[in-house]
Amino acid sequence: MRWLLEYGERDRHLETIALLTFALLALLYYVLASGVVGVTQTQGQIAGSQYVPDILLALFRTVAAVLSVFTLISICTDEEGSLSLPTLYDSRQSEEVLLLGIHRLVPFTVWSFAAFGLYFSVAAASSWALVLGGEVPGWALAAVPLAFATACGTALLVTSVVTFYLIPNNAAKGYDVRKYFEWHEMLMHNGNVVILGADLVLGGVDMTLGMVAFPLLFGLVYIGFANAYAVLGGGIYLYDFLDPRLRGGPAIHAILFVVICAFYFLALALDALSEWNVLVGVVAVAAGSYSIITLRKPSEFRGQPA
């Protein structure tokens, strides 16, 4: 399968762009035709909880939202920056690059955590409205489930990719993986699933099968951004497999769509288990989170300093 990540005699960017365009149009048509955006849930589902006092849920969501904003600001203001091993757009070779300032917002991990923060910000505001005796706006009743679906689907993807691909793959190449174990990185690819899992169990937000369109659209927007950043801005692909010119460009992007769907369906299954039996849901969420988060120390990976 390594040949998929190689450059062939002819660039495959036209085929990849055609696939992405078709996927975008199909998803937009589905969203508009299905009416999934207009489906609202009750105020109690969006803002309340059957298992803890509403004020505790509001506080929990507020802390999560503040934590997200603080983390994103912290990584942008970190003067040490972050070393990455991207593919240079012009030379098509991998090379260490130090990301500083606003460039730290480029990784998909950060985008996913921003979606996490957006969900918790709107959900927290909705919970406080309920606690204070107000009404949750109609737009929030519609937006919160879609934001939750996007945050859950992308969080599972990020955590799994970092744990099972990025850390071991970079460690095998002799690249220092200690950056993945800094507090903000651990929060964005470990704490994300733990916090969202807790909200999934405690809150009442429902996810549906049709909402899979939103993690997919989120992924498409990021792919568009990654290409614009490589061509017009930073000159790098942080993820080598997102270069549409690769021999396996169309196949890789099709696989990515399938993977995003798979992780969303996993989140949907955990949500269904929690609704069926909260204790079963707690066990399933805890086991699922434990199985994909990174608990090993950097020194435990081959080729890393003790």
Model-derived regions: residue spans:
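Membrane-interface loop-to-helix entry segments
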Residues: 181-193, 250-255
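Early transmembrane hairpin module of multi-pass membrane proteins
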Residues: 2-4, 11-130, 143-145
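Membrane-interface transmembrane-helix boundary segments in multi-pass integral membrane proteins
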Residues: 2-21, 106, 233-295
